[in-house]
């Protein structure tokens, strides 16, 4: 039974959680304290951990693509932008990033921080802590899904507790989800506020338990 949510890394200044769900939520920014935040929340019977790391498709694809043999253009997919000039720019940036990440893929912390930043490694550790304690962990956005992908490459036992909130229309993310085998809660492919996406996903999971 879902009674409360710990939301890590979400911006709660532009969206009112209670507009979508009455379930209690606690917010924490991404920091080195996140693993401790997760353990404390679970000890206090929090039932869901939501994680958001980044909405940057190039960065997330750079992390996922480090472990794949797919080229930059195919990882991005033509439909990911819809603007040819921006797509060419993104494909070039991703190609350059992959040259770096593919040499770092054996160094977990380095490849995560190089793509998604220092705080993303804190989110990664929080994600592992949550799933290891058999707590539903909802991944929102490309960055969090990429972190889940990396986590499952190291520990497949986490799969049953990692849930993907929604499916972005980007091949790199699709490939990651396919490898993970995790449940995708929604398949709207709509671009909504990350916190709204978490609220909708939590409500869907709660409804499925009734």
Each predicted region: which residue ranges?
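N-terminal loops that bind phosphate or other acidic moieties
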Residues: 1-210
């Amino acid at each position: 039974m879902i009674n409360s949510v710990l939301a890590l890394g979400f911006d709660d200044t532009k969206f009112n959680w209670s507009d979508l769900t009455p379930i209690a939520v606690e917010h924490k920014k991404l920091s080195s304290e996140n693993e401790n935040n997760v353990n404390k929340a679970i000890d206090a019977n929090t039932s869901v951990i939501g994680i958001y790391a980044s909405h940057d498709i190039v960065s997330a694809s750079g992390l996922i693509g480090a472990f794949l043999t797919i080229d930059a253009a195919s990882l991005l997919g033509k439909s990911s932008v819809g603007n040819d000039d921006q797509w060419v720019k993104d494909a070039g940036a991703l190609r350059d990033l992959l040259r770096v990440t593919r040499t770092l893929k054996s160094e977990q912390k380095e490849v995560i921080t190089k793509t998604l930043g220092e705080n993303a490694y804190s989110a990664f550790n929080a994600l592992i802590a949550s799933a290891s304690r058999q707590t539903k962990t909802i991944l929102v956005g490309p960055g969090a899904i990429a972190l889940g992908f990396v986590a499952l490459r190291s520990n497949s036992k986490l799969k049953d507790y990692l849930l993907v909130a929604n499916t972005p229309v980007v091949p790199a993310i699709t490939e990651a989800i396919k490898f993970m085998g995790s449940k995708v809660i929604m398949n709207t492919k709509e671009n909504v506020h990350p916190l709204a996406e978490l609220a909708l996903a939590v409500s869907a999971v709660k409804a499925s338990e009734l």
